[in-house]
Design a protein with these regions (language model features):
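Gram-negative bacterial Sec-dependent N-terminal signal peptides
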Residues: 1-21
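Intrinsically disordered, low-complexity peptide-like regions
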Residues: 15, 26-28, 191
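Short, low-complexity N-terminal intrinsically disordered segments enriched in polar/charged residues
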Residues: 21-88, 92
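Short beta-strand edge/turn micro-motifs at domain boundaries
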Residues: 31-33, 151-159, 169-201
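Short beta-strand segments enriched in hydrophobic/aromatic residues
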Residues: 63, 162-164, 194
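A solvent-exposed, acidic/Ser-Thr-rich amphipathic alpha-helical stretch
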Residues: 70-146
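Acidic, glycine-rich flexible loop segments
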Residues: 128-176
Length: 202
């Protein structure tokens, strides 16, 4: 059963009086919940569920493309492609990005800069010596299973599972949350990316 987000009480938690006058709404698709938060409508066009799903697919396609580029042409070529992906999909040109990768720890857990994100995906940076390149692990396909998408004007958040299959047929599942904003050119930019391995009690 899809989970429906109950956001009716959210307005009381927000300081701006204008929000209290606009109720939140909820809806659902066949497999996951969609929430549209009430609030002051931004000047930019509201982000839609279709745009969020397209952005998710673009991310998955890019990860597979970087892995393929690495296998075909080596690390330098993969790094160039990864840089292009960061420049088009992420919001580092807007400021820090709240990026917590799956396989990161210690002082380099959070990758708020483009440099840190690039190192995580393709390695090869002495400032991030533990990074071996998450995007270089032979990924061949992916599947996305959303638990919820939250829409709020020109911002959106999703959470769910991403299943990644490598060239050995092994599947890695990661719990993933993304947050997007619409930039001045109308494109969606990732400004939040949190990824972790599923918790195991054993």
């Amino acid at each position: 059963m899809p989970k429906i987000l109950a956001l009716a009480g959210l307005a009381s938690l927000l300081a701006a009086p204008a929000y209290a006058q606009l109720p939140a709404t909820t809806a659902h698709t066949d497999t996951y919940a969609v929430a549209t938060l009430g609030g002051v409508a931004p000047a930019a066009a509201p982000i839609t569920v279709a745009e969020v799903e397209a952005a998710q697919r673009a991310w998955g396609n890019a990860l597979v493309a970087i892995s393929t580029e690495y296998k075909t042409n080596g690390q330098a070529a993969a790094a160039r492609l990864a840089g292009q992906v960061l420049d088009t999909a992420y919001g580092y040109s807007l400021g820090p990005v709240a990026f917590k990768p799956t396989l990161a720890s210690g002082e380099t857990t959070f990758r708020t800069t483009r440099e840190g994100a690039l190192a995580y995906f393709v390695g090869g940076d002495a400032n991030f010596p533990s990074d071996t390149g998450f995007a270089l692990k032979g990924w061949q396909s992916y599947a996305i299973d959303n638990a919820a998408i939250v829409l709020n004007g020109s911002t959106a958040i999703s959470t769910g599972n991403v299943m990644l299959t490598n060239d050995k047929g092994e599947v890695t599942t990661v719990n993933k949350s993304w947050g997007w904003v619409r930039d001045a050119n109308g494109a969606l930019r990732i400004v939040l990316h949190h990824s972790s391995l599923p918790y195991s009690a054993h």
